[in-house]
Amino acid sequence: MQVDLLSSAQSAHALHLFHQHSPLVHCMTNDVVQTFTANTLLALGASPAMVIETEEASQFAAIASALLINVGTLTQPRVQAMSAAVEQATRSQTPWTLDPVAVGALDYRRRFCVELLSHKPTAIRGNASEIMALAGVANGGRGVDTTDAAANAIPAAQTLARETGAIVVVTGEVDYVTDGHRIVGIHGGNPLMTKVVGTGCALSAVVAACCALPGDTLENIASACHWMKQAGERAVARSEGPGSFVPHFLDALWQLAQEVQA
């Protein structure tokens, strides 16, 4: 199994495209991470919109550059709104990304996510346990936390990618991005990133935005993982703990985006 690495030049090019196109991302995400997710997108140069009302979700999915579906705080009204948005995104050819939070631990959301797969997401982003559960390989995970190493989920990610046509991202100490054939590994980051709520969910929003960019979608998505890991490393160097990490992380994302424009 060959795992390719992303070059700094590829990452910088994708970030330049990101800033140039400034995708409008329709984020149907969970209650815990909305502010952090929006600020992450803004720091990189995208435009977030948190539209969750069923009557509006379908309409907005048609005009957004990309759609994110994150099932972290799932409710029946949100299921209806998310379904409407995904159906409209499919009709409008709006790229959409699925973040199957805790899908390995809870049956209701697993069934819902499996139903959504029939609408062919552009990308799927989850930890190892979530990706393996969604692929039908195993059920597991401790709530939103993974109990599996990312590398162990690569075969499941490849299968899921081939079956759905999505680019699948497995995040962990090393992130892996695959279209079912190619695999790109992204190293870096810091364990402190797991002590802050929302870094993975925010990454899913950035992945969604990258699906709207021109060029190689797999490389663009892998670049999103790289930016987040880079920013995490920079932020940790300036932080004293989780509380000071968040503002430094947002600053680091902003600085990365400014550097490619210089």
Swiss-Prot record:
One of its GO terms (biological process) is thiamine biosynthetic process. GO terms for molecular function: ATP binding; hydroxyethylthiazole kinase activity; magnesium ion binding. ATP binds at residues 125, 171. Keywords: ATP-binding, Kinase, Magnesium, Metal-binding, Nucleotide-binding, Thiamine biosynthesis, Transferase. Pfam families: HK. Its EC number is 2.7.1.50. Substrate binds at residues 50, 198. It is an enzyme of class 2 (transferase). It catalyses: 5-(2-hydroxyethyl)-4-methylthiazole + ATP = 4-methyl-5-(2-phosphooxyethyl)-thiazole + ADP + H(+). Pathway: Cofactor biosynthesis; thiamine diphosphate biosynthesis; 4-methyl-5-(2-phosphoethyl)-thiazole from 5-(2-hydroxyethyl)-4-methylthiazole: step 1/1. Its cofactor is Mg(2+). InterPro entries: Hyethyz_kinase, Ribokinase-like. Belongs to the Thz kinase family. Catalyzes the phosphorylation of the hydroxyl group of 4-methyl-5-beta-hydroxyethylthiazole (THZ). This is Hydroxyethylthiazole kinase. The gene is thiM.
